[in-house]
Structure formats: C-alpha cells, structure tokens
C-alpha cells in the first residue's frame, strides 16, 4: 500500500479550538479507516508545520479524497507528499542507467 506524508497547519479555526484537536484526530483516524486509509502515525511538530502524519492508502485517488475531506472541514490546511520506502528508494536509484542521455 502506498505511503503518504501529510504536513498540516492549523487554520485560525483549528488553533482557536486546539484543545479539541485530539478528539478530531481520533475521529479523523476512524473516518480514514472506514475509507480504507490507515493513519499510521501523527506527530505534533515545532516549526513550519503543526502536525506531520504518516498515512497508508490503497491508491492516490483514495488518499486524495481523504485528505481533501479533512481539509474541507476547515481546521487544517494540508500539504501532501507521496513517500517511497527504503526498499523502493534502493530499487529506483538502482534502476538509473549510467548514461543518463539514454532515458
């Protein structure tokens, strides 16, 4: 199953109700689960983003639907990254031909 990294920032609405964010996280995890998406990890972060989440979804379309639904609630804005495992990374890099002019 593909892995995605979601970078979240609280909106003005979200930060005003920050004490309710753990309950919203639980509800979001359950809604994702019902959609076939697994919220594997959620981290409170210091810096540019307020939360970083590791998410598995069956495909890009399912993930996009879930993350857009999350954003539409107005508590967070999101930026998403598709992630590749270390094994996938090694396979991708290993497939690079020595002569890059032969793409």
Task: Indicate residue ranges for each PLM-predicted region.
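A compositional/biophysical signature of low hydrophobicity enriched in polar/charged and small residues
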Residues: 1-103
